[in-house]
Amino acid sequence: MNPNQKIITIGSVSLTIATVCFLMQIAILVTTVTLHFRQYECDSPANNQVMPCEPTIIERNITEIVYLNNTTIEKEICPKLVEYRNWSKPQCKITGFAPFSKDNSIRLSAGGDIWVTREPYVSCDPGKCYQFALGQGTTLDNKHSNDTIHDRIPHRTLLMNELGVPFHLGTRQVCIAWSSSSCHDGKAWLHVCVTGDDKNATASFIYDGRLVDSIGSWSQNILRTQESECVCINGTCTVVMTDGSASGRADTRILFIEEGKIVHISPLSGSAQHVEECSCYPRYPGVRCICRDNWKGSNRPVVDINVEDYSIDSSYVCSGLVGDTPRNNDRSSNSNCRNPNNERGNHGVKGWAFDDGNDVWMGRTISKDLRSGYETFKVIGGWSTPNSKSQINRQVIVDSDNRSGYSGIFSVEGKSCINRCFYVELIRGREQETRVWWTSNSIVVFCGTSGTYGTGSWPDGADINLMPI
C-alpha cells in the first residue's frame, strides 16, 4: 500500500470513529433529556393515562443510578399510588384467637410517668397498628389523678401511640376529646373527637392532621361516639354517634365522612331500640357494627350500614348466649334476632362480636354481673338462628378473679383475607379498689388465628399495694 492509500485509509477509519462517537453522544444526550422529563411522569394502571408523580402521596421514593460511558444518570422510579382501602377481601377463617400485644401500663405506672386513661382501642393503617385511649390530662403518680373516675372533663385528650407502646409523657395528643373514634382510609387518619358541655358538646372531624368539619349536639344530652375504630370503604368513612338518654330513647345517627368532611347523615332505622358504643368492622361492600343497648336489652344490637346509598338497618345478635353485662345466666337468657330481650338491659358495657357464616364469634365478661374476667367463643347458628346456644372453641382471656372492662374489634388486612382482632380494657383503681384515688387501665390484644393455641390468663397484673395512691 503506497503512502497516499495509507493516508486515505487512516482518514476513512478516523472519520468513521468520529461519526460513531458523535452519534453516541447524541444518543446519550437524548437519553439524559428523556429520563429527566420522564421522572415526573408514571403510567396509571387504572386507565393507562399519564399521571403526574409530584402531587400524589407516595409510599417510597427510589432512585436508580444508571452508568453510560462514564455519564451518571439518576432516574426516579415512580412509586405505587396510595389508594383508598376497600376491604373487599374475604374474612379469614379462624379457629380461635392468639395473643398479640399487652402494654402493661398500670404496672409501669408504679415507677414511671404514664398517662391516666380509659376507653382504649386499637386501629391500623395499611402498614402499622396503633393504640388509642382517652387521657385524663395527668399521669398516674400525680395528684391530678385523684377522682379520675369521671368520664367528661375538658382536659381529656385522645392519645395515640404505636401498638405496644404505653402512653408515656412523649405521647402525641391528637385532639381534645372525652369520646372518640379513629380510622385510616388508606391515605390518612380520620379522628372524630367529642368534647364540651354535656348539653352542647362539639364533635370535631380531623383528617390528615387538619380540622376539616364539625357538628354540634343535636339532642343536648351527651353527644357521644364509638370508643373504637370507625371504618372507611373507598374513601367514605362511617361513624355511629348517639345523643340522648343513656337509659331511655336516644337519637342515633350514622355519619358518612369523606376526607374529614361530613357528606351525609342517616338516622338509625330497623328494630334496634338503643344503640351506643358500637364496635364496627368492614363487611364489603358495607359496614357492620355490634353495639350496646343500655336501655332494654342485654343482647347486642346490630347496625348494618350501606356505604353506597346511605341506608341503615338494625336488629340484634341471634345468639341466646348474650354478650352484655349485666345479663341473665345462660340457661335463662334469650334473643330472637329482632328485638331487645328486656333482660337486665339498663346499664351495660362496650363489647363486640362478628358473623362467620351462620355462626357468630363473640367476647364477653365471664361474670354475668360485673366487669370481671373475659372469655371468647363461637356460637353455632348464633348469627342466623334465634336463641342459639351451642358454644364451641371457648377461650379464657382474663380469669374471673381479675377485672376487665370495655372491649372492641379492629380489622387487619392480610395478603389474602381480612383478620378480626379484639382488645380488652383492663380497668384498675376506683370504684372497686378504694386504696387509691385514681381510675386507669391497661390493655391486652388478641387476633384471629387459623392455627392451634394453648391456654392462659392475661390480667393487668399490677399489685395495687405497690401503686401510688
Curated annotation (Swiss-Prot):
Residues 323-350 are annotated as: Disordered. Residues 36-88 are annotated as: Hypervariable stalk region. Its EC number is 3.2.1.18. N-glycosylated. Glycans are attached at residues 61, 69-70, 86, 146, 200, 234, 402. Residues 91-469 are annotated as: Head of neuraminidase. Residues 31-469 are virion surface. It catalyses: Hydrolysis of alpha-(2->3)-, alpha-(2->6)-, alpha-(2->8)- glycosidic linkages of terminal sialic acid residues in oligosaccharides, glycoproteins, glycolipids, colominic acid and synthetic substrates. GO terms for biological process: carbohydrate metabolic process; viral budding from plasma membrane. Substrate binds at residues 118, 152, 276-277, 292, 371. Keywords: Calcium, Disulfide bond, Glycoprotein, Glycosidase, Host cell membrane, Host membrane, Hydrolase, Membrane, Metal-binding, Signal-anchor, Transmembrane, Transmembrane helix, Virion. One of its GO terms (molecular function) is exo-alpha-sialidase activity. The active site is at residues 151, 406. SUPFAM superfamilies: Sialidases. InterPro entries: Glyco_hydro_34 (IPR001860), Sialidase_Influenza_A/B (IPR033654), Sialidase_sf (IPR036278). Ca(2+) binds at residues 293, 297, 324. It is a single-pass type II membrane protein. The influenza A genome consist of 8 RNA segments. Genetic variation of hemagglutinin and/or neuraminidase genes results in the emergence of new influenza strains. The mechanism of variation can be the result of point mutations or the result of genetic reassortment between segments of two different strains. Intact N-terminus is essential for virion morphogenesis. Possesses two apical sorting signals, one in the ectodomain, which is likely to be a glycan, and the other in the transmembrane domain. The transmembrane domain also plays a role in lipid raft association. Belongs to the glycosyl hydrolase 34 family. This is Neuraminidase. It comes from Influenza A virus (strain A/England/878/1969 H3N2).
